[in-house]
Design a protein with these regions (language model features):
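Active-site SXXK
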Residues: 34, 72, 106-108, 232, ...
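Conserved catalytic neighborhood of penicillin-recognizing serine enzymes
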Residues: 332-333, 376, 380-430, 641-643, ...
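Short, glycine/proline-biased beta-turn/loop segments that scaffold the active-site neighborhood
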Residues: 371, 611-613, 621-624, 650-706, ...
Length: 943
């Protein structure tokens, strides 16, 4: 047996398998030992070493520079805040898995943010309107760029018909874009509520804009609460690519006063990125840039220089060690020429003046264009001071519910009436309808045009049926049926089934669309409210109480009780609120509701104030755009986003007469002593224009140029225009000759081009026809207030026309001056001698001496009033230009109150500004927050 065992082992040791087996055992042992060493003994160390091999470089944003006034008062600055960013750095097996996980993560973040009172950043170009429908927030080239980006094309011209989608990408509606993004690109499940799906789309689209740039995180929320910071920190292990970062947000002091100058910041758009990165490759699609005003113009200087850091990150993308870091450098500080205190005072005084005009014309028997109280009531609804959508909210008050009940009943009646007119056998001709029904159908047709269902470009204006519609002799039913027959209707814009094959069925589908649309359309509802208010079905008392219900007015138990008990009438109540500017002219958006003022240092040409009323709160547009607020600004009838000082142009009225004086004196057609007899009616031209004084039963008699300015004598300046057109009666009358002379001297006074101010400014328009009418500021003269400001400043300083600037200097973050700015003399008006200049100055001084508002005013002021009519159905524009002190001018002023009734109101406002500037009256007395006691409210021409 022993021999057998011995033989067995001898056989094994002689076998080749033994060698192989031994080698296998040894190798396996080494492998086991190595795995034990890797995973157990040095597992953590090797894991760290592996993790640290992932190196990334990221940009460190610089701190934006401040914007300050001429005296160093801070107007725009930065405030430290926390932001939340997300970067798609996960690993996925499929696009489907990526969408599912990423969408779920974003939904969780949104839910947590909203629970903590925070919101996502929403710069998406589609919003949800008041009717719950998707709509674009941009138009024109911005919309084209957005559509190209959505469908992944380099330009709008590359968009084409997509068979799979079933529509032309270039003509995609907001609904189609949303469906494409949600379903096709981002795979957002139908399980999400519509509102959540929209918000996920907003975030995913923002992330997609950075997708081509490696390691660029997308900021999805800024200035978040401590609770949201804690949420991210506590859930860091499951929030892939999500971080809380130290950030800054842009803040603006005294926002409404300076927003029209400073503008605001926001996330860079694709168009802005393409433009800015062409000159500076440091820009990224996650940058914050200036979007308007000085913020935009001086963006490169305010931006500063970015830094960077190289760091190791772990598998979750979290930084674990910084390898290299270069600190960013702060942006430069920009100083404006504007005086903060003067700007604020001029704005508040302007609001007080406009409020006074509105107050004095409500139910005024002395006003030629009084404001009916029902117009005031409706203004609360029409300009969204009162939110009519809240009437149907579950939290609506009893007052709101009562009004909603009245509205609902009337709405059903109106909709039935509209249906009858559209579908009935005997529709009425438009002209035979009552005013209310005409308003409804006018709105319906206009909406069809606006939504490009009724194609304006396709309409044949010579078509007989179209002309009958225009004259009101056919019904809307006949007109729309004819429009379908003529292919003026785009049926692809509204839902139509295959069963709608002929024109009758298409018309039925169009009617269904119209009725569905107006049933929820806010604009249509407002027309219903208008007539309910006019009829007294919705009372002023109800609307006044709703102002308290909705928090428009601060709760006041005593005033509410007085309204409820009829101790105070709604008319008195509202007038009191307007007088105290608790309800502002801008909120009502009645005539007048806007104005502007430009104040210049006449010796240096520096702009000291550039006021546009109303303003807006640019804090709500910077950083994270308040979408609801931005939408409200765009629909606000007082147009707060419009700069009335630099963009609004109207006829200058009689403020232009100094141009005609310069032209007449410089060409020699008049001298300072030339006298012209005012005969009332100017007979030398065919339209026989009249001097305004004749309407009051008198003429100005024999007067010279100074007296003509004093009296604002139209006849005198008609004759100056005629003399310019006839070379002082030496040749026959020639329009071109006369107008070229007026253009020459208007240009010499700076009225031929923009002033040079850095922000948006519309081009001036010197009249190019009818020199006789142009000489009094009519014809087609049109100027912005800032252009009149430069012009009157040149008059005040005897001919120096300045190139304006809003800037004073730029300093680095340490206060070192890098660049200075000062107005440059564009040209000098050297065509008049001292005697001629004095004749103009004397006339302007006499203008002010004649104005009752300047009685006993201790500062000598020179100026010129102007009244311009834009529409016979609306009040006149009120203008005033002037300077002070008369003997040694320091500042000039140009002001316009659009639809301000009479130039007396503009002059009164200018006096108050001079009073503030020169300290004539205590600032607290002037700026008392009360509507100005307007002494003149007639809508007449006295200049």
């Amino acid at each position: 047996m022993f021999d057998n065992i011995k033989e067995f082992f001898r056989t094994i040791f002689k076998s080749r398998l033994l060698v192989a087996a031994t080698v296998m055992v040894l190798l396996f042992s080494v492998l086991i030992f190595r795995m034990f060493q890797l995973q157990i003994i040095k597992g953590a160390e090797y894991q760290d070493n592996y993790t640290l091999k992932i190196v990334r470089e990221r940009t460190l944003n610089s701190t934006r520079g401040n914007i300050l006034d001429r005296n160093g008062e801070v107007l725009a600055y930065n405030e430290l805040a926390y932001s939340i960013t997300i970067e798609d750095n996960g690993s996925y097996d499929s696009t489907k898995e990526k969408n599912k996980l990423l969408n779920a993560e974003i939904a969780d973040i949104i839910t947590a943010l909203e629970k903590n009172g925070d919101d996502i950043i929403n710069n998406f170009k589609i919003t949800v309107n008041d009717n719950g429908n998707y709509e674009f927030t941009v138009s024109g080239s911005s919309l084209k760029r957005f559509l190209a980006d959505v469908f992944g094309q380099a330009s709008y011209s590359d968009l084409k018909y997509d068979k799979k989608l079933g529509y032309n990408q270039a003509e995609a509606t907001a609904d189609q874009v949303m469906d494409y993004l949600k379903v096709t690109r981002f795979g957002i499940s139908e399980d999400y509520a519509e509102n959540m799906a929209y918000k996920i789309t907003v975030v995913r689209y923002a992330m997609s804009e950075n997708s081509y740039q490696k390691y660029i995180a997308t900021t999805i929320a800024s200035d978040v609460s401590e609770e949201s910071v804690a949420y991210v920190s506590e859930n860091t292990s499951k929030l892939q690519g999500v971080e809380v970062i130290d950030d800054t947000i842009r803040k603006y002091n005294d926002a409404e006063y300076f927003a029209s100058i400073i503008g605001y910041t926001g996330k860079i758009s694709t168009e802005e990125y393409e433009s800015l990165s062409a000159d500076n490759d440091n820009y990224t699609l996650n940058d914050v840039v200036g979007k308007a005003g000085i913020e935009q113009v001086m963006d490169a200087s305010l931006q500063g220089t970015k830094g960077y850091e190289k760091l190791y990150v772990d598998y979750l993308g979290k930084a674990v060690e910084v390898l290299e870091r270069e600190e960013p450098s702060a942006g430069n500080d920009v100083y404006l020429s504007i005086d903060k205190n003067l700007q604020i005072a001029a704005y508040d005084l302007l609001e007080q003046e406009i409020a006074g005009i509105v107050y004095s014309n409500i139910e005024s028997s002395g006003s030629e264009m009084n404001i009916p109280i029902t117009d005031v009531y409706f203004a609360l609804v029409n300009n969204n001071v009162i939110d009519i959508e809240h009437f149907s909210d579950e939290k609506a008050t009893e007052n709101e519910k009562a009004v909603m009940h009245i509205f609902s009943g009337r709405q059903q009646t109106v909709l039935s009436s509209v249906t009858s007119e559209l579908e009935g056998a005997s529709p009425a001709a438009f002209g035979s309808l009552g005013e209310e029904d005409q308003d409804y159908f006018t709105y319906i047709i206009n909406q069809l045009k606006e939504k490009k269902i009724l194609l304006q470009k396709s309409i044949d204006k010579t078509d007989e049926v179209y002309q009958e519609w225009q004259s009101g002799t056919i019904s809307a039913q006949e007109y729309l049926n004819h429009a379908i027959a003529q292919n003026w209707i785009d049926i692809t814009q509204f839902t139509i089934d295959e069963k709608y094959s002929d024109s009758t069925e298409i018309y039925d589908a169009l009617c269904d669309y119209i009725m569905d649309d107006i049933a929820t359309d806010t604009g249509f509802s407002k027309i219903i409210y208008l007539y309910l208010i006019k009829a007294g079905s919705v009372s002023g008392k109800q609307l006044c109480l709703i102002l308290y219900d909705q928090g428009v007015l601060a709760y006041d138990a005593e005033e509410i009780s007085s309204l409820e008990s009829n101790a105070v009438s709604p008319v008195s109540f509202l007038k009191d609120k307007i007088r105290n500017i608790e309800i502002t002219p801008a909120q009502l958006a009645l005539d007048p509701c806007s104005g502007s003022c430009v104040i210049t240092d006449v010796k240096t040409g520096e702009l000291l104030a550039l006021v546009s009323y109303p303003g807006y709160d640019n804090n709500r547009l910077a950083n994270t755009v308040d979408a609801d607020y931005f939408a409200s600004l765009n629909t606000d009838l007082s147009k707060p986003l419009y700069n009335y000082a630099t963009q609004e142009r109207t006829a200058p009225g009689s403020t232009f007469k100094m141009v005609s004086s310069v032209a007449g004196l410089a060409t020699g057609v008049i001298t300072p002593t030339t006298q012209i007899m005012d005969k009332g009616v100017y007979e030398n031209i065919s339209n026989h224009p009249r001097c305004w004084a004749l309407n009051h039963g008198y003429t100005h008699g024999l007067i010279n140029v100074s007296e003509a300015l004093r009296d604002s004598c139209n006849y005198f300046f008609y004759d100056v225009g005629y003399r310019l057109a006839t070379n002082n009666f030496s040749t026959s009358y020639d329009d071109a000759t006369g107008i070229s002379k007026i253009q020459e001297y208007a240009s010499l006074l700076g009225l031929d081009e923009t002033t040079g101010v850095e922000i948006e400014e519309n081009d001036p328009q010197i009249a190019d026809e009818y020199p006789v009418m142009a000489a009094i500021g009519q014809s087609n003269n049109n100027y912005a207030t800032i252009q009149l400001g430069r012009y009157v400043s040149a008059i005040a300083n005897d001919g120096n026309v300045y190139e304006y600037t809003l800037l004073s200097k730029v300093c680095d973050s340490d206060g070192n001056t890098l660049e200075t700015y000062e107005p440059k003399v564009r040209n000098t008006v050297d065509v008049l001698d001292t005697t001629q200049w004095n004749a103009i100055h004397t006339g302007m001084r006499m203008v002010v001496e004649k104005l009752s508002t300047f009685n006993d005013f201790p500062i000598e002021v020179a100026g010129k009033t102007g009244t311009a009519q834009q529409s016979p159905n609306r009040p006149n524009h009120a203008l005033f230009v002037g300077y002070a002190p008369y003997s040694d001018p320091e500042i000039s002023i140009a002001t316009r109150i659009a639809f301000g009734y009479t130039s007396h109101n503009a002059a009164e406002y200018a006096k108050n500004v001079f009073s503030y500037y020169f300290g004539v009256q205590d600032a607290e007395e002037l700026l008392n927050g009360q509507a100005e006691n307007v002494g003149e409210s007639s809508n007449s021409f006295n200049d």
